[in-house]
């Protein structure tokens, strides 16, 4: 492990040289994984993506190429926020990997306005693609730069705003997302009003009535704040109780931008990327999220981490990244045997616009329905195919007969195994 850690930078630089070219996209995101022990100096309490409140955790970031192939990883203390990791990635792309022109893609919580201004804007050749948060979208509507009423279907439109003079803004509208958010808001507001009514009742009971302006406010925040709907209510809290009323104007204002999101891009000219390409580039962050799911769940399982020294923890995460690098390439090669959609470009071309979700290609739908490949052979998940390949073993045989030397013998591959080995470009001497 120490041997591997000492060579991490050299290995990552080699991967970058192979897969990151001048002007390419570099996808970056951060996740966390929790700790059971308490002696690792990196393990701190922070925002848990695993929903493990109160547990110590570490954070680690993953830098990938535009297809989601891992290039580099970095471990951070568990209390380090997403934006505070951006500077090191920008430095890595420019200095360690030697890229003179690159586009860093990160989500709205990662590439905040402060990080763009302080860490990216002054770096020549380093462009960025991200998205605006909800508050910023509202501000654009209020200043008149964005007009939601002009959209009635899936749509993409580039706008300009004096608030972002050196950036390109692309408004996207997704009616399906609009409907989903509206339904979710109705559901959350119903729960919010139910909880508020319960607390209000507690302040009015005859015995042990809940009293105290601060106590009532704290309980409201504790029991109701998690639904994030208090912004739509006007609360009047007194020492002996409180009243609440729905703010319909606030609800209407939020509903007006349901289904809208805005992509922001800096230092990217229109002749380099069209509006739709900016949208598709941002959506490629889902490839990093897919990598995190693989690293943290069924296939690789990054935890539990049985290390406490920083160097060993960093080596452990790096080893997991390298394992995912191998798995990524295996899945690419074995795609004809899996349920993988091999015609994603065809499916993308069938969309009305880039804001519309990508449906499965006709061939992928056929795969899912018939569960066979184009030659009628049964398809597999990656996990079941790996179980099948585990049946191929190499035995070292020592005969009990004097004079006969030790020899090795491999399992003769079955048809499915043979097909997989051929796709992977591997030879078997099984007999």
Can you describe what each PLM-predicted range is?
Residues 1-431:
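Anion-binding and metal-coordination hotspots
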